[in-house]
Amino acid sequence: DLDQEALRPWFPLPQVLQGLFSLCTRLFDVEIVAADGEAPTWNDDVRFFRVKRSDGTPIAGFYLDPFSRPASKRGGAWMDECLGLSKKPDGSVVLPVAYLVCNQTPPVGDTPSLMSFEEVETLFHEFGHGLQHMLTTVEEPEAAGISNVEWDAVELPSQFMENWCYDEPTLRR
C-alpha cells in the first residue's frame, strides 16, 4: 500500500502545475501562462491563466481555485464552463474560459501546498475536462468544448490526462 501522506513532499503545487503545463506544451503545442490580475477573482487564492498557441495567439483562459475553504466551497474537485467559444454577430470571437476547482490543503507559511498523488491525479483529470473545453475550435456554442458530449465519451480527455501522472518524464518535471 502506498502512503499518500509520505508522498506529499514530492508534489508541491507549483511544481505539479509546472509539470502539467509542460505536458500540455508537449502534447498540444500550447503555452499556459499566469495572468493574475487580468481577470477578477472571487478569492485571493484564485489564479487566472491564459492558454496560447505556440505563436502566442490567445485561445482560452481558466481560473484555478486550488484550496479548501470549507465555509464557502463544497468538497471534491470539478471543472466547469465559464464562457464557451463562440462567434458574436459582429464576427468577433469569445474565447473559452473554464473553472478548475480543487480542495487541496492550503500552503502553510513558506511551505507550498503539498499534494498527495491522488490529488495530483485528480488535478490532471479535471484539467483534462478543462482542455476539452479550452482547446475546442468549434464556434457553435451547442457543439463547442464540453457542450453536448455523449456520456460514454465525457471522461475520455480527463482519463487520458490522468494517465500521464504515471509517465516518468512528466513525474520528473
Regions found by a protein language model. Give the residues of each.
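Cation-handling catalytic/transport regions enriched in His/Asp/Glu
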Residues: 1-173
